[in-house]
Regions:
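Extracellular beta-strand/beta-solenoid scaffold signature
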Residues: 1-6, 23-33, 52-63, 77-95, ...
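Short "repeat-start/strand-capping" segments in structured domains, especially the N-termini
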Residues: 10, 36-37, 65-67, 96, ...
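Short N-terminal "domain-start" leader segments
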Residues: 211-213
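A short, charged, amphipathic alpha-helix used as a generic interaction element across diverse proteins
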Residues: 234-249
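N-terminal segments that cap or nucleate solenoid repeat domains
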Residues: 1-44, 221
Length: 250
C-alpha cells in the first residue's frame, strides 16, 4: 500500500464520517484489524473533544497486522492520536502498514502517530500541530515516535507547536518523570531519550525503532526531527500547506 489509490476490492472503505464518540468497545474512534484486509479511510474527522479522557483510547488504531491508507482526514482533541501496532501481541504486527496522506493531527496528548512492533508508517503532506496540550495530556507527550522495530518516514510534513509549556510547568515535570521511568524500565542508556521533553519530540525513535524524513518543516528550534536528510521545507511553503489542509479538512 503506497498511497490513496486504495485498498482493493477485498478491503474496507470508511469515508465521509464525522466521528464525535468512540465507536469501539475499547474507546477508539476507528479501529482497523488485520482481518479487515487493506482499508482506506478518507475525508473523515475524528474529534473526541467532548469525551473525558478516561473513556477514550485512540483516535485511530491498527492492530493484528492492520494495513490502511488514511487520507484527507483530521484527528483532533483526543488524548492519543494514532497508534499502529498491538503492544499486547506484537507477533501479529510485522506485516502491518500505515500510510497517512494530507492529514491533520492536532490538539492531542500524544501519538501522531506512534508505531511499534515492527510496523511501517509513511507520512506524506501531513500537519502535526500542538501535541501535549493540557486539555488532552495525561502522563507524557510526543508526536511521531517509532520503537521496538517499527519505522516511520515523513515526507513534506509540518511539525508545529504554538507553545513550549503546552500542559504548564506541572505537565512538563510529569512528562519528563514518565519518560525517565519508561527509559529506566527499558534499560535505555541514551540520555537524550531520558531527558528530551515530550513537546520537543516531533519525530523520534528509540528502543530499536527507526525514523527518516525529507523536506519537512518545524516552527521551533527545539522540536527534534530525527533522521532528516537534505534541505527543509521553507516557512512559506509550510504555511501554505497548513492553510490548504485546514481549508479542505473541515
Amino acid at each position: 500500500m503506497t498511497g490513496s489509490e486504495g485498498a482493493g476490492s477485498s478491503g474496507r472503505i470508511i469515508e465521509d464520517q464525522y466521528i464525535t464518540a468512540p465507536i469501539s468497545a475499547g474507546g477508539d474512534g476507528i479501529t482497523v484489524y488485520g482481518s479487515d484486509g487493506p482499508v482506506v479511510i478518507r475525508r473523515c474527522v475524528v474529534d473526541l473533544g467532548s469525551w473525558p479522557l478516561e473513556r477514550l483510547d485512540e483516535g485511530i488504531s491498527g492492530v493484528d497486522g492492520a494495513r490502511a491508507v488514511v487520507c484527507e482526514t483530521r484527528v483532533t482533541r483526543v488524548g492519543k492520536g494514532i497508534l499502529w501496532g498491538n503492544g499486547d501481541h506484537p507477533g501479529t504486527d510485522p506485516d502491518a502498514e500505515l500510510v497517512l496522506e494530507d492529514c491533520i493531527v492536532r490538539d492531542i496528548g500524544r501519538r501522531a502517530p506512534e508505531a511499534q512492533d515492527g510496523v511501517r508508517v509513511l507520512m506524506r503532506r501531513c500537519v502535526i500541530r500542538d501535541w501535549g496540550v493540557g486539555s488532552r495530556f495525561t502522563v507524557r507527550s510526543f508526536a511521531a515516535w517509532a520503537h521496538d522495530g517499527a519505522s516511520i518516514r515523513a515526507e513534506d510534513c509540518v511539525f508545529w507547536q504554538d507553545h513550549f509549556l503546552q500542559a504548564g510547568l506541572r505537565g512538563l515535570v510529569v512528562d519528563l518523570a514518565n519518560w525517565i521511568g519508561w527509559c529506566w524500565n527499558r534499560r535505555d542508556r541514551n540520555p537524550l531519550h531520558w531527558l528530551l521533553p515530550g513537546v520537543c519530540r516531533g519525530l523520534t525513535a528509540s528502543q530499536g525503532g527507526t525514523v527518516s524524513a525529507v523536506r519537512c518543516y518545524k516552527n521551533r528550534w527545539w522540536i527534534r526531527l530525527s533522521g532528516h536528510e537534505g534541505p527543509r521545507m521553507g516557512k512559506k511553503e509550510a504555511l501554505a500547506l497548513m492553510a490548504e489542509l485546514e481549508g479542505r479538512l473541515l
